[in-house]
Amino acid sequence: MTIDTDSRATPAPPPQTLAQKLIARAAGRPHVMPGDIVNCQVDLAMFHDSSGPRRLKPMLDELGAPIWDRSRVVLVLDHYVPAQDEDARRIVGTARDWAREQRLPHVYDSIGICHVVLPEQGHLRPGMFCVGGDSHSPTGGAFGAYMFGIGATDMLGVMVKGALWVRVPQTIRMHWDGLLAPGVCAKDMMLHMIGRFGMNGGGYQAVEFAGPAVKALSMQERMTLSNMSAELGAQVGLVEPDETTWRWLAGRGVERVAGDWRSDPSAEAIVHRFDASTLEPQVAAPHSPANTEGVDNFAEVRIDVAYIGACTGAKLEDLRAAASVLRNRRVAAGVRLSVAPASAHDQRVAEEEGVMRVLRDAGADILPNSCGACAGYGGSIPDGANVISTTARNFRGRMGSPTAQVYLGSPYTVAASAISGYISDPRLVLA
């Protein structure tokens, strides 16, 4: 029997998740499957003063190798600025000197935290494959980019070759039905998921956030989801780009590009479902983001310090949320409220909107646009203090003092707690 091979139909490509499509593009393949190991071309590499030059410069000097493409490298000075001691001055000086030596075109010095500055400056768009020298680099996934954190050795390889191998992950879809109530936000969604699945629940796979509640979020709220996918143990935290994405990017000078950056309906994924309409404000107890329960379980916890800061919790949307609670109110006696806006741009807009005035009038101290206490730098958290913070992590000693008890909450919850002196439900203030 003769078979006419020319008449055979071409097999349809297998359905792909968003993560698979992003990796396939970077690998130059029509499709990839979970478990495949592929070599990906890097569109963008980002690092900061702590993770970058002081570690990369000696290794690059030893190799005698040039950077593969300076236009695809972004350096942000955010961890040790403003420098407060000799070690910090040395680290920051090394970064600045190396940036000049390498003639890097994209250097952002003391204007905010890298994960906020990067999209703010128009460096991200859907379809990109990016790496960052920081564990919260998955923030880029909010824009439909495949972005994750890598260490100095892997970053060295990227600097020289512009490529990196990855094992294609499975996709875990966190599907949120319903809509969030006033006073409940993306930070509460993330704390709830981390509390439910633990800090290894993501299994270094690709987490995709989906559903009506996610689509209703602003870009900066989506950034909070992707940012804290790191605390969920995921490699990346993706959100399907939509009109909200492109409108936000257009305001940063990013032109729309074509691409089918969404999961195919029949693509294989592990799906977990949640109802946003029933979610209450969440609080994580010391010393893990996984120690999460509803806010009412912490009503008797007195606080000494309320901190609104970090890439997770001090963006413009976060500052607005805190101000909505603090307006015409004062911080409780004996409580210190510190606010470190995540970027100079967001602080400037917040000034124009009157948000910063509300925070100051409530008694807040305004700190520089940097990682600050989240990175344990600056000695701003007293020993033995009870702290409620908008940061992403509350490991022992994370904010500097090994004896501080750090609780995590949303900007709404932190602000409400600051005015009552106890961990408090912001919905009671906003009602």
Where are these regions (language model features)?
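Fe-S-dependent hydro-lyases/dehydratases of central metabolism
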Residues: 1-431
